[in-house]
Amino acid sequence: MKRFIIGLLFLSCVFTQGVKIFISADLEGVVGAVTGEQLGPGGFEYQRFREFMTGEVNAAIEAARSAGASEILVADSHGNGQNLLIEKLPKDVKVIRSWPRPLGMMEGIDGSFDGVIFTGYHSSTDNKEGVRAHTFSSSRLTSVKVNGKTMTEGSWNAAIAGEFGVPVIMVAGDDAAVK
């Protein structure tokens, strides 16, 4: 949580007026996420963790606005893509939900954005320090590597943003993901 707050404070110092921000929101890396019961519609704590996810996204939105963001797009990128409590998001924020998406967790990104924020991110399957570590779908993938380097969902999505010339300006997630 401390790193998340520090990241938000840093973000508030980065931009001037009129910037456009893309937020990719995942759930496994939100504060307190430790079991599958918290992460899917059938889980007894799922509704509570939807609240946490939405709260972290709203904190990122608030920080981006404090730093001058005038347009924000949020991609609900966990599981079925229908996790954020959209009624609790600011009305002028655009949200991408559900699937299919040609760019996956980065659907909607293009070169018009000034920065990308990742919330709720987690480490890869290869990182044993991660609590909910996986890479995209652990039932289908155990590891993704590019030129011999292990890719996390975050590094993969950062590469997609980079393809459009958009920098990742903040990552919030579990300890293993943000190291």
Regions found by a protein language model. Name each.
Residues 14-21:
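Boundary at the C-terminal end of the N-terminal hydrophobic targeting segment
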Residues 91-109:
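A glycine-rich helix N-cap at a beta->alpha junction
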Residues 74-83:
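Acidic helix-start/capping segments at beta-turn-to-alpha-helix junctions
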Residues 138-164, 170-173:
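Active-site glycine-rich loop that binds ribose-phosphate moieties when present
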Residues 3-13:
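Sec-dependent N-terminal signal peptides
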Residues 39-59:
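Short catalytic helix/loop segments, enriched in acidic residues and glycine
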Residues 123-137, 145-149:
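Conserved mixed alpha/beta catalytic, RNA-binding, or beta-rich assembly cores of soluble enzyme
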